Design a protein with these regions (language model features):
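Conserved beta-strand scaffold positions in the cores of enzyme catalytic domains, especially
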Residues: 3, 60-64, 177, 404
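C-terminal cap of metal-dependent C-N hydrolases
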Residues: 21-26, 357, 377-412
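Metal-coordinating catalytic core of metallo-dependent amide/deamination hydrolases
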Residues: 111-128, 134, 142-255
């Protein structure tokens, strides 16, 4: 048994069986001051007041929190970290006034990453992806959803997903794989979008399923990318092979993606920078988690999602990093939490729940992660002594992590 002692405040306590928070629940953060927490194997086995702490046995490892907080490790439910190289020239293009759409129309953006990935060996792609995972763990993230979508050919999409499978096996973090062949139309299919959709549905999805390479299927349903009808078809094809739907929608325009996501009982609908009351209404009483990506809004200078309005309407939201080389080159969930507070006007409690339990829900791992709950995996951050939960997004550049534990093991 491992015992974490002298915890200044244990934060993120959630009763067993609660898998997401919605509406007013988003302001609730269960906590216990002057606490201990025990770990058996990989899982949380108990916690309580320090004066009730069990006496450690000779085989037990004791971690003294020294008055720091213990919180659940962040869950990042939307990333594209399996990519090759960098795209800082596009960063300069944006500074010089080109829009995301203009860069894409010139052959940059996603297609640029697809070209780089095609020229990169599987071994090198694995090395680059693992380096990003290690970076994210060091910043407190313990679960990562990882998408394909920079292949855009059958061979390169499979290459990406095989790399993600290796990362899942080798990393201490919890990794979930999403097939995103419908991220853009492959360069070889320019002007033949329907043929590319046929390729995704009739060749890519069956091949991905045959190797068991993904849990989820995703589509970029937005202006200039894939239509509602195409999205509907691709999600149906994925579901026929047991893949659970997720969707990119409403980053560039109100695309109808939210409605098709709800139709398919998608686990999450992500981006939502541009939504109306119709989208909020469509999400009521659905299983679909609205997921917002403030790092992308920050980097691209586009509107932020209407997070506060979603919560006021009784919905939950998740926040994720969208870590990718073109529109959000960062996997720092603490900064995501800060942007949720600073730019989206979420309270620290709301932003915390959005980055932990609700993001765990949005990647299908809330039964095991995202909260301090007996029986869940011990993916934990032990902080340096800090005054409050609000300090984390408030002083968002001040180092706050003392230790990261994943599956009960001290990683960094």
């Amino acid at each position: 048994m491992n015992i974490i002692t002298h915890i200044g405040e244990l934060i993120g306590i959630v009763p067993e069986g609660v898998l997401r928070k919605q509406g007013a629940e988003m302001d609730e953060v269960g906590s216990l001051r002057d606490a201990y927490l025990t770990i058996e194997g990989e899982r949380i086995s108990g916690f309580g007041n320090m004066y009730e702490c069990p006496v450690p046995g000779p085989q037990d490892e004791v971690i003294d929190a020294e008055g720091g907080m213990v919180i659940p490790a962040f869950c990042d439910s939307h990333t594209h970290i399996c990519y090759a190289g960098t795209r800082e020239q596009e960063f300069i293009d944006k500074i010089n006034g080109l829009s995301y759409e203009e860069i894409a129309a010139r052959g940059g953006g996603i297609l640029n990453s697809a070209d780089l990935l095609h020229r990169t060996s599987e071994e090198e792609l694995y090395s680059q992806t693992m380096a990003r995972v290690r970076e994210m763990i060091a910043k407190g993230t313990g679960a990562i959803e990882n998408k394909s979508g920079y292949g855009l050919t059958l061979e390169d999409e499979l290459k990406m997903l095989r790399v993600i499978r290796r990362v899942k096996k080798d990393s201490p973090a919890t990794i979930k794989a999403t097939f995103l062949g419908a991220h853009a139309v492959g360069r070889a299919f320019k002007g033949r979008q329907n043929e590319y959709v046929n390729l995704v549905c009739e060749e890519m999805i069956p091949a991905v399923a045959a190797e068991g390479l993904a849990e989820y299927v995703d589509v970029f349903c937005d202006e200039g990318f894939f239509t509602v009808a195409e999205t509907d078809r691709i999600l149906s094809a994925g579901e026929a092979y047991g893949l659970i739907p997720k969707i990119h929608a409403n980053e560039l325009a109100c695309s109808g993606g939210v409605q098709v996501a709800v139709k398919h009982n998608a686990l999450s609908v992500d981006h939502l920078e541009r939504t109306t009351d119709a989208e909020i209404e469509a999400l009521r009483n659905s299983r679909t988690m609205p997921t917002m990506l403030p790092g992308s809004s920050f980097f691209l200078g586009i509107p932020y999602g209407r997070a506060k309005e979603y919560v006021s309407a009784g919905l939950g939201i998740a926040l994720a990093s969208d870590y990718n080389p073109g529109s959000s080159p960062s996997g720092d969930m603490r900064f995501v939490m800060a942007l949720g507070c600073i730019r989206m006007r979420l309270t620290p409690a709301q932003a915390f729940n959005a980055c932990t339990l609700n993001s765990a829900y949005a990647m299908g791992v809330a039964e095991d992660l995202g909260s301090i709950t007996v029986g869940k995996l011990a993916n934990l951050i032990v902080t340096k002594p800090v005054p409050s939960l609000a300090f984390i997004p408030y002083c968002h550049q001040t180092p706050f992590i003392a230790k990261v534990l994943l599956r009960g093991t001290h990683i960094c």
